[in-house]
Amino acid sequence: MELLDGRALANELTHAQQTAVETLKEQGVTPKLVVIMVGDDPASAIYTQSKQKRATKIGMASELKRLSAETTEAELLALVKTLNDDRTVDGILVQLPLPKQINEDHVIQAIDAKKDVDGFSPVNIGQLWLNQPGLVACTPNGIMRLLAAHKIDVAGKNVVIVGRSNIVGRPLAALMLNANATVTIAHSRTANLKALTKTADILVAAIGKPHFFGIDAVKEGAVVIDVGINRLEDGSVTGDVDFEALQTHVSAMTPVPRGVGPMTITMLMEQTIEIAKERVKRG
């Protein structure tokens, strides 16, 4: 079995990103990412720190805007508008989830599509489904890069994606379709789920159920991408597939951790750098 090691690829790409940032600085532009965090959700704080740490590592400018949990939607939208208008800001990211008094859709739609490094805006999602250039959700983008790095061609393959979220399942389906795969999206209402997943040449598991997919649900020789992050009672982290059972059954598989996760932040940095390159072109 080939191990699809996201951490190793992320480290390679991080070195390349450091060089790209140095080149941009020589041209008078420092890529800048602004992360907005509303409230003090512990998980959000960890994700936010990881993003800032990586940005600093590659030499980018990074700013965290911390707002209280009582922040109104109008106040948050006003901040987003200010950042949209700031020419020194390349990427804007609003850490989700938001407090209940704020409509997430309104906020995502307010972010300038050209600065929407999460790739969640309706404009970017529309461009993705039309197979046109735009900013793409980072986890699906990272999955495609990981497959490409291991020379796994998805064209003509049967791809089953289990999970239909706007963050992973739906955008990944579009990317796979654009790469000429035959795509099926499965979800909680799918009948005979494991019979369906067993037909997949490439299986993407993103349902949040530890060890849900074993040999009975996976075709021999398949490629398995495990997006699941599940914390067990002993504190360990595991994915949606039974990694141990499948090691001798599949041709390639991502581990959890060290698989898809490291690629997500790496793609976030890459998109911010690409936006900064466009700023250089505009002068």
Curated annotation (Swiss-Prot):
GO biological-process terms attached to the record? L-histidine biosynthetic process; methionine biosynthetic process; purine nucleotide biosynthetic process; tetrahydrofolate interconversion
In Gene Ontology terms, what is one molecular function of this protein? methenyltetrahydrofolate cyclohydrolase activity
Q: Which InterPro entries match?
A: Aminoacid_DH-like_N_sf, NAD(P)-bd_dom_sf, THF_DH/CycHdrlase, THF_DH/CycHdrlase_cat_dom, THF_DH/CycHdrlase_CS, THF_DH/CycHdrlase_NAD-bd_dom
Q: Which positions are annotated as binding NADP(+)?
A: 163-165, 188, 229
Quaternary structure and partners: Homodimer.
Q: Which family does it belong to?
A: Belongs to the tetrahydrofolate dehydrogenase/cyclohydrolase family.
Annotated PANTHER family: C-1-TETRAHYDROFOLATE SYNTHASE, CYTOPLASMIC, C-1-TETRAHYDROFOLATE SYNTHASE, CYTOPLASMIC-RELATED
Q: What is this protein called?
A: Bifunctional protein FolD
Organism (species): Latilactobacillus sakei subsp. sakei (strain 23K)
